[in-house]
From Swiss-Prot:
Subunit structure: F-type ATPases have 2 components, F(1) - the catalytic core - and F(0) - the membrane proton channel. F(1) has five subunits: alpha(3), beta(3), gamma(1), delta(1), epsilon(1). F(0) has three main subunits: a(1), b(2) and c(10-14). The alpha and beta chains form an alternating ring which encloses part of the gamma chain. F(1) is attached to F(0) by a central stalk formed by the gamma and epsilon chains, while a peripheral stalk is formed by the delta and b chains.
Membrane topology of this protein: Peripheral membrane protein
Compartments where located: Cell inner membrane
Entry superkingdom: Bacteria
Keywords for the protein's UniProt record, in alphabetical order: ATP synthesis, Cell inner membrane, Cell membrane, CF(1), Hydrogen ion transport, Ion transport, Membrane, Transport
Gene symbol of the encoding locus: atpH
Native species: Shewanella sp. (strain MR-4)
Designated name of the protein: ATP synthase subunit delta
């Protein structure tokens, strides 16, 4: 994955710079998300790794995307096809989203809890994270009964493990040392 990120970074940065310059960050985010979905399609995958000429591949990809991709987005697709990089579109989309969130002073936080969180609990977590990170926080909540109780929160580089499973694991490590 690190290699894909390295390959995708210049494309994501260039797309983001163009998006900011043209005040079209949300439009670009939607285009890249759609293009990433197309590139991940099981019918499209063999074409991306096959021996199809880059101009034909770009034309095919653009025709599949249709009106979802504007002229600037089509130019990005053409350049990526020419360099054999269409398979990294999901990584480009992901990096673009990170650049967008950083630019908008937003962060996505993954919250995994043992049981479904109430709206009040979600609001408390969101407020606490916004204070700690000095950013607007968007929560992605999920459940995992294996946590036993508590939550695990991941927001950027920050990881807070308040789960019983995590506490038991840390206790076990201390006892073994």
């Amino acid at each position: 994955m690190a290699e894909l990120t390295t390959i995708a970074r210049p494309y994501a940065k260039a797309a983001f710079d163009v998006a900011v310059e043209h005040n079209a960050v949300d439009t670009w985010a939607e285009m890249l998300t759609f293009a990433a979905l197309v590139s991940e399609n099981e019918t499209m995958q063999p074409l991306l790794t096959g021996s199809l000429a880059s101009t034909k591949l770009a034309a095919l990809f653009i025709s599949v995307c249709g009106e979802q991709i504007n002229e600037q987005g089509q130019n990005l697709i053409k350049v990526m096809a020419e360099n054999g990089r269409l398979k990294v579109l999901p990584a480009v989309s992901e990096l673009f989203a990170q650049y967008r969130n950083e630019w908008a002073k937003e962060v996505e936080a993954d919250v995994v809890s043992a049981a479904e969180l109430s709206s009040e609990q979600k609001q408390q977590i969101s407020i606490s994270l916004e204070k700690r990170l000095a950013r607007k926080v968007k929560l992605n909540c999920s459940t995992d009964a294996a946590l036993i109780a508590g939550v695990i929160i991941k927001a950027g580089d920050l990881v807070i493990d308040g789960s019983v499973r995590g506490k038991l694991s840390r206790l076990s490590e201390k006892l073994q040392s």
